[in-house]
């Protein structure tokens, strides 16, 4: 009888312990990708080991499905506690009232240690809707050895890029990539516009009911792209243009740090292990004129907390661990090739992990020039028109002036 009572007491204690656990539901599209699932899981497991009263329940969909899924769940009044976001997803979810204000959850010291352009990009009407879990904005990946073998230097201006393309073409090598030029994801192509000194949909012009699109600089940019197209110098218009860089079909790629692990895995003979650091570097973006600084639009992977979550404080502790801990930096963020969001943590890694021309390139040639992404409620509709106009320049013979004129008219219609 006494043994039975002891067993009953033990079972009650175990049940009570299980019931007292804080459940945090985490939707991570990176957890759904084969290349990154294990690193995400390692951080989740470590957090649960350190916090035995917390259980993280994982969910994942493909990258392309995640935004719509989260929007649908939020509109129905049900979502996960923590969600991994990308692109303009924080803006869309925040304007729908689905995200908690991180200003009320995160320590000021932690936020001050992040890139401010990153935080401003995910701020809507004073509300901080998400924080970076990886500084993932794009850099100008360059195969300097490929350039050197062809007697060429790293380009400084777009004229340099064109002149290099002319020489590369002689050896059946493409002069540039434009692999993101499809769909309506404007953020993926703004690097080109910004570094031709064209700033579509910028907040200052929009406040004056101007699009920021039809400018003299845009005509120069589109004329340049048409000239490159006539040369047949582009490695890709859509699809995954990363492959062209990995197999030396093109000397440049605009991409995040994700090219580091993906390049290693895709072409290990050339880029496996530390060999990638001997082949590739991250250089400054080409600019319109010598002496100009590049302009890098923020594209971060971010974490947000659902406004309806019952465990916001506990969720924030997990978010900070996932984004800003030494363990996450070593076991997850390192595996993505990205830079850790807290700048103090990045500085600690300068003499080891980041002591190469890729990470240093991001830190010195790209991230000092980060600028806020100008999201708005018509981002996707406007983005589709702008991207379609760039496609028309590259893929058709329609006069550049006519492309600009009709696109400007369409933008005026949907924006104002």
Task: Give the predicted meaning of each segment.
Residues 39, 319-342:
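Periplasmic-binding protein-like
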Residues 93-98, 117-154, 179-206, 297-306, ...:
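Periplasmic solute-binding protein
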């Amino acid at each position: 009888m006494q043994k039975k009572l002891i067993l009953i007491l033990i079972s009650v204690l175990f049940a009570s312990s299980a019931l007292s656990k804080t459940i945090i539901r985490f939707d991570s599209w990176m957890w759904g990708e084969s290349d990154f699932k294990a690193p995400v899981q390692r951080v989740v497991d470590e957090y649960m080991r350190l916090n035995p009263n917390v259980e993280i329940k994982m969910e994942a969909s493909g990258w392309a499905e995640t935004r719509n899924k989260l929007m649908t769940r939020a509109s129905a009044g049900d979502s996960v506690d923590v969600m991994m976001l990308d692109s303009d997803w924080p803006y869309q979810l925040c304007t729908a009232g689905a995200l908690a204000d991180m200003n009320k959850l995160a320590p000021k010291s932690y936020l001050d240690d992040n890139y401010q352009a990153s935080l401003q990009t995910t701020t809507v009407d004073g509300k901080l809707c998400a924080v970076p879990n990886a500084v993932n904005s794009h850099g100008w990946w360059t195969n300097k050895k490929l350039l050197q073998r062809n007697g060429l230097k790293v380009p400084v201006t777009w004229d340099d890029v064109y002149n290099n393309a002319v020489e590369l073409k002689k050896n059946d090598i493409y002069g540039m990539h434009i692999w993101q030029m499809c769909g309506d994801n404007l953020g993926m192509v703004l690097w080109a516009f910004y570094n031709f000194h064209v700033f579509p949909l910028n907040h200052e012009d929009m406040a004056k009911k101007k699009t920021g699109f039809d400018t003299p600089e845009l005509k120069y940019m589109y004329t340049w792209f048409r000239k490159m197209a006539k040369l047949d110098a582009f490695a890709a218009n859509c699809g995954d243009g990363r492959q062209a860089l990995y197999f030396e079909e093109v000397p440049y790629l605009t991409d995040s740090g994700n090219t580091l692990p993906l390049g290693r895995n895709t072409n290990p003979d050339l880029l496996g292990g530390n060999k990638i650091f001997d082949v590739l570097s991250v250089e400054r973006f080409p600019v319109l004129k010598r002496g100009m600084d590049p302009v890098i639009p923020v594209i971060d992977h971010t974490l947000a907390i659902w406004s309806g979550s019952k465990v916001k404080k506990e969720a924030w502790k997990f978010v900070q661990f996932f984004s800003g801990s030494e363990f996450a930096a070593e076991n997850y963020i390192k595996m993505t090739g990205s830079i850790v969001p807290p700048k103090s943590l990045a500085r600690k890694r300068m003499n080891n992990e980041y002591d190469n021309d890729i990470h240093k390139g991001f830190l010195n040639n790209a991230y000092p020039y980060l600028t806020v992404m100008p999201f708005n409620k018509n981002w996707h509709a406007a983005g589709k028109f702008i991207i379609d106009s760039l496609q028309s320049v590259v893929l058709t013979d329609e006069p550049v002036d006519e492309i600009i004129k009709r696109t400007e008219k369409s933008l005026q219609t949907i924006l104002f």
